[in-house]
Swiss-Prot record:
<comment type="function">
    <text>The glycine cleavage system catalyzes the degradation of glycine. The H protein shuttles the methylamine group of glycine from the P protein to the T protein.</text>
</comment>
<protein>
    <recommendedName>
        <fullName>Probable glycine cleavage system H protein 2</fullName>
    </recommendedName>
</protein>
<dbReference type="InterPro" id="IPR011053">
    <property type="entry name" value="Single_hybrid_motif"/>
</dbReference>
<dbReference type="InterPro" id="IPR000089">
    <property type="entry name" value="Biotin_lipoyl"/>
</dbReference>
<dbReference type="GO" id="GO:0005960">
    <property type="term" value="C:glycine cleavage complex"/>
</dbReference>
<keyword id="KW-0450">Lipoyl</keyword>
<dbReference type="Pfam" id="PF01597">
    <property type="entry name" value="GCV_H"/>
</dbReference>
<dbReference type="InterPro" id="IPR003016">
    <property type="entry name" value="2-oxoA_DH_lipoyl-BS"/>
</dbReference>
<comment type="subunit">
    <text>The glycine cleavage system is composed of four proteins: P, T, L and H.</text>
</comment>
<dbReference type="GO" id="GO:0019464">
    <property type="term" value="P:glycine decarboxylation via glycine cleavage system"/>
</dbReference>
<dbReference type="InterPro" id="IPR033753">
    <property type="entry name" value="GCV_H/Fam206"/>
</dbReference>
<feature type="modified residue" description="N6-lipoyllysine">
    <location>
        <position position="73"/>
    </location>
</feature>
<feature type="domain" description="Lipoyl-binding">
    <location>
        <begin position="32"/>
        <end position="114"/>
    </location>
</feature>
<dbReference type="InterPro" id="IPR002930">
    <property type="entry name" value="GCV_H"/>
</dbReference>
<comment type="similarity">
    <text>Belongs to the GcvH family.</text>
</comment>
């Protein structure tokens, strides 16, 4: 785990980084990933008060919303890191969105997706490239991460 300005960056994840949108993906099986938002994203959003996650069985294109979130200062989409189908939804995150702020890489996961094309994972940031890209975003936004 790399920590930059109090922001946790797990090294074993894949990252979809587009502008200020930062989403992580963890390979659970050869064709299934777990998806959530990063520590940076939850810090920039502030206290998340509502999350709407696409229903199980929904097909989502890469970059299109797999969920939407609202906080006191922000509302917006959570992009799918790859194209695929929602196979499981974190009902606990929908019921108590604060867990996304408290544990974005653990209990605060959003969906599990069956990938249409597992090769798309190679297009995401990972390893040192991901760490460098996220560190640059932390610096440009002058962020210090905090958990609620």
């Amino acid at each position: 785990m790399v920590v930059e300005s109090n922001c946790e960056i797990p090294e074993n994840l894949y990252y979809f980084i587009e502008g200020k949108n930062t989403v992580w993906a963890k390979l659970e099986s050869p064709d299934t990933i777990v998806v959530g938002i990063t520590d940076l994203a939850q810090t920039m959003a502030g206290k998340i008060v509502k999350v709407r996650i696409k229903k199980k069985g929904t097909k989502v294109e890469k970059g299109r919303p797999v969920a939407t979130m609202e906080s006191g200062k922000w509302a917006g989409p959570v992009p799918a890191p790859v194209t695929g189908e929602v196979v499981e939804v974190n009902a606990e995150a929908e019921k108590s969105p604060i867990i996304i702020n408290q544990d974005p890489y653990g209990k605060g996961w959003l969906v599990k997706m069956k990938m249409s094309n597992p090769e798309e994972l190679k297009q995401l940031f990972s390893g040192q490239a991901a760490i460098q890209k996220l560190k640059e975003l932390i610096a440009s936004e002058k962020l210090t991460c905090k958990r609620l």
